[in-house]
């Protein structure tokens, strides 16, 4: 063992839960030198020696009922973490979150690193989507992945100094000198945006002709946000392309380190600003997992209803703009009018439209208003007829069919390799929907179907979105008909302040109330994560608590980060016009990609 390798503690007792069977398979293959970490989750977290991580990952990728998807990969600076009893010594920890559809289970592999030797072998030879995840870990933590084909910054500019998710890097702007940009600095920054093909391994031409390089974005209507993709063109054919992200990066994971558990909620629905309350869900449920909070049944159903309202709103926008990018102008205007009906309901319930920040740890901010049923019933009566009109106007339109059929097509194997979830995966015939596979918030009590298509092309992706609107209406109808009575928030000291009369009678209760309200509640030490089906795919908040009022580390796995990474594998060899259709049918919000 090298001096900088980390020794494993003694092996841990066998866990009998089905998801932990893979641990015994690992021990059978590699011996006992693994450490299984106790977390609040229902799947194993296994520490592996750095020297064996490649073969362990390869084994998990090829084992019977394999872990076909690298769902997430990131790191954590552990140098200031106080409550890590029994864990392997580690300055920086890299984790690999793997997903198996056949097992319907996950495993998290962790590797401990010494701060003087932040080197790991790349996993891009096992899962191609490790490329961007490893670049992000390099960008944010300075971890070097040996053998990576293009290890460079991804969210921050190339000239950036430091690695922001390290603990010595301040989270507050007041810790730095004011930002001033003069002409020289502007020229310097603009020069670093210049695309040099050789830096990306691209050739300027071949023996017969020169290629043209075209910047699409970062301010282009078809990019659907602050996103640049550089195209290597031979005429109209895309020979290769380089997606360039980070223009919308706000450092939301760093922000979480200086917000209390409650005050971070408004930041979550700004990750995907079209997702609204659906974006609150994985965060609050991860915190509830940490705190052991049981959410009342009424609050669970209210959450489901709000989630599905925002799913409808997102999908109406998606379908309208996708059809518009294919040349159909009419549907988008009607769909925007229908979205206002959904916003009216959301505003009546939450008080806001786009950024309600309405879910709370333990439930919701308040109960449903009087006569909420009337607005919901009006939507349920209105939308089915409109959907029939949209289907006829768009999905039977020969122009739309011609522009989307067999365009930007990929199969299920490719989707899994690139970490695609949501409608992009279901358009290839795989019905993975977290609401069905791993029901949460009472979804197991609802009768709904998971729409799938099998062609994996642009038409299939739009059609799956459209069919999901029908299923969301079906779920909302069940919420309307079966809304339980009872409290809308858990009566738990980490979720709500104590009753007012008790604070006036008992000094200890008053002190607890004062500390909880002024400083925020202290969550138990440990780790928890929760996966939900947000409007664009599967999203996870992975939280590390150091028994403090704020998160020690918040990892946000968003679906669209890896969806954009897939672009070159799908579009190379196609036409520029096909790329426009592909971008329109990915369903992307750049704040969700860049965080």
From Swiss-Prot:
MF-aspect GO terms: NAD binding; NADH dehydrogenase (ubiquinone) activity; NADH:ubiquinone reductase (non-electrogenic) activity; quinone binding
Record keyword NAD present: yes
Enzyme Commission number, as recorded: 7.1.1.-
UniProt keyword list: Cell inner membrane, Cell membrane, Membrane, Multifunctional enzyme, NAD, Quinone, Translocase, Transport, Ubiquinone
Keyword Membrane found: yes
Region feature NADH dehydrogenase I subunit D, mapped onto this chain: 210-595
Signal peptide: none
NCBIfam families, per the entry: NuoC_fam, NuoD, PRK06075.1, PRK11742.1
Protein name: NADH-quinone oxidoreductase subunit C/D
Native species: Acinetobacter baumannii (strain ATCC 17978 / DSM 105126 / CIP 53.77 / LMG 1025 / NCDC KC755 / 5377)
């Amino acid at each position: 063992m090298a001096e900088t390798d980390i020794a494993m503690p003694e092996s841990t007792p066998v866990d009998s839960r089905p998801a932990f069977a893979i641990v015994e398979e690992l021990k059978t293959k590699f011996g006992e030198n693994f450490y299984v970490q106790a977390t609040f989750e229902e799947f194993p977290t296994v520490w592996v020696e750095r020297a064996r991580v490649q073969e362990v990952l390869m084994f998990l990728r090829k084992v019977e009922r394999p872990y076909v998807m690298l769902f997430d990969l990131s790191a954590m600076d552990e140098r200031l973490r106080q409550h890590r009893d029994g864990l392997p010594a580690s300055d920086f920890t890299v984790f690999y979150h793997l997903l198996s559809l056949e097992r319907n289970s996950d495993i998290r592999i962790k590797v401990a690193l010494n701060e003087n030797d932040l080197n790991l072998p790349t996993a891009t030879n096992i899962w191609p989507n490790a490329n961007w995840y490893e670049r992000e870990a390099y960008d944010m933590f300075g971890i070097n992945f040996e053998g990576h084909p293009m290890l460079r910054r991804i969210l921050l500019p190339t000239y950036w100094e430091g690695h922001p998710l390290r603990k010595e890097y301040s989270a507050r702007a007041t810790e730095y000198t004011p930002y001033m940009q003069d002409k020289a600095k502007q020229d310097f920054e603009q020069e670093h945006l210049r695309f040099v093909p050789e830096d990306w391994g691209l050739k300027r031409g071949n023996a017969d002709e020169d290629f043209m390089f075209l910047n699409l974005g970062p301010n282009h209507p078809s990019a659907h946000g602050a996103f640049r993709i550089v195209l290597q063109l031979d005429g109209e054919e895309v020979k290769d392309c380089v997606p360039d992200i980070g223009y919308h990066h706000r450092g939301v994971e760093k922000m979480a380190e200086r917000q209390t558990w409650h005050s971070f909620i408004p930041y979550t629905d700004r990750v995907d600003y079209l997702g609204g309350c659906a974006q609150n869900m994985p965060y609050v449920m991860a915190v509830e997992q940490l705190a052991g909070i049981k959410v009342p049944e009424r609050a669970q159903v209210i959450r489901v209803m709000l989630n599905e309202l925002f799913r409808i709103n997102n999908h109406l926008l998606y379908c309208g703009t996708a059809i518009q990018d294919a040349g159909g102008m009419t549907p988008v205007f009607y769909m925007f009018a229908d979205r206002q009906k959904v916003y009216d309901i959301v505003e009546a319930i939450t008080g806001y439209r786009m950024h309600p920040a309405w879910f709370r740890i333990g439930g919701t901010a308040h109960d449903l208003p009087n006569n909420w049923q009337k607005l919901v019933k009006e939507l349920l009566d209105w939308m089915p007829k409109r959907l029939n009109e949209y289907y006829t106007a768009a999905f039977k339109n020969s122009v739309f069919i011609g522009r989307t059929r067999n365009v930007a097509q990929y199969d299920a194997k490719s989707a899994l390799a690139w970490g695609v979830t949501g409608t992009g995966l279901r358009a290839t015939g795989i019905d993975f929907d977290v609401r069905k596979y791993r029901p949460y918030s009472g979804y197991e009590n609802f009768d709904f179907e998971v729409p799938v298509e099998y062609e994996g092309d642009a038409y299939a992706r739009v059609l799956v979105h459209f069919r999901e609107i029908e299923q969301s209406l079906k779920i909302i109808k069940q919420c309307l008909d079966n809304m339980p009575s009872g409290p809308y928030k858990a009566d738990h000291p980490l979720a709500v302040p104590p009753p007012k009369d008790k604070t006036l009678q008992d000094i200890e209760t008053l002190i607890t109330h004062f500390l909880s309200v002024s400083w925020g509640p202290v969550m138990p030490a440990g780790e928890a994560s929760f996966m939900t089906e947000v409007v664009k795919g599967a999203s996870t908040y992975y939280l590390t608590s150091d028994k403090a009022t704020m998160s020690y580390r918040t990892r946000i796995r968003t679906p669209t980060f890896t969806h954009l990474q897939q672009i070159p594998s799908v579009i190379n060899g196609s036409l520029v016009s096909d790329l426009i259709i592909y971008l329109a049918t990915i369903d992307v919000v750049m704040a969700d990609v860049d965080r």
